[in-house]
Regions:
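Amphipathic alpha-helical segments used for helix-helix packing
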Residues: 95-117, 165-173
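Amphipathic alpha-helical linker/stalk segments
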Residues: 58-85, 121, 127-136
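C-terminal peripheral helix-coil segments that are non-catalytic and often amphipathic
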Residues: 92, 96, 124, 128-140, ...
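Hydrophobic/aromatic residues within well-ordered alpha-helical segments
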Residues: 8, 51, 58, 62, ...
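N-terminal intrinsically disordered/low-complexity leader segments
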Residues: 1-7, 14, 202-204
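Hydrophobic alpha-helical connector segments
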Residues: 71-100, 145-155, 184, 204
Length: 204
């Protein structure tokens, strides 16, 4: 019974991510979510109680990976290695959580009305920590004197664009869906821009 419950919740959550990403919170309908999930509409309310709760769960499904992406900043490490790992993880999140990433981006653009105060505080605290780490590397002469805030913003923009603007990327590349080689090229390109552009010293 538990496995059926988890499977149904996962189906609904995935369908909701797609619906909210395509239509936004206001326009998305639970009936469409249920149809996309291949389940009766009452199941949506049975497992999630309301459309708003379901929307919050979609946000939660992307917030946790975003926080975990900063793990390299939370332990001792060389800046080049930390930045490489961070960028690769951010690219992977954009690939594996594309719809939820779009929902999160839309939520942020609208002032994050559905994001809990606790999650907002956690995200802000982690960003502040990452910025402090970058500033520390600058102070130690391990990289160029760039603005750490804008470096972090640039990494966010460069990596998240592969989820948030996938339609544009598909139009330019002529591919309906990027493959492993494309994502590897994306990660390597961003890494090179950051490491070389910010003159980050490589570990000896």
């Amino acid at each position: 019974m538990s496995s059926i419950r988890e499977r149904n919740k996962e189906l609904i959550l995935r369908a909701a991510s797609e619906e909210f990403a395509e239509k936004g919170f206001a326009a998305a309908k639970t009936s469409d979510i249920a149809e996309r999930a291949g389940l009766p509409k009452p199941n949506v309310y049975y497992y999630f109680k309301s459309k708003e709760n379901l929307y919050r769960e979609v946000l939660e499904s992307i917030v946790e990976p975003l926080l975990e992406a900063s793990a390299p900043f939370n332990q001792p490490g060389h800046p080049a290695e930390v930045l490489r790992a961070y960028i690769r993880t951010k690219i992977r999140i954009s690939r594996e959580h594309a719809c939820a990433s779009k929902v999160f981006a839309s939520e942020i653009m609208h002032g994050a009305p559905h994001l809990s105060a606790e999650r907002t505080e956690q995200l802000n605290a982690q960003a502040a920590h990452n910025i402090a780490c970058i500033q520390s590397w600058i102070d130690q002469g391990l990289m160029a004197k760039v603005d750490p805030n804008h470096l972090l913003f640039s990494i966010w923009a460069a990596t998240q664009t592969y989820a948030d603007f996938d339609w544009q990327i598909s139009a330019v590349t002529g591919k309906a869906k990027l493959d492993d080689a494309d994502y590897e090229a994306a990660a390597e390109t961003i890494i090179r821009l950051v490491i070389k552009g910010c003159e980050v010293q490589e570990p000896v």
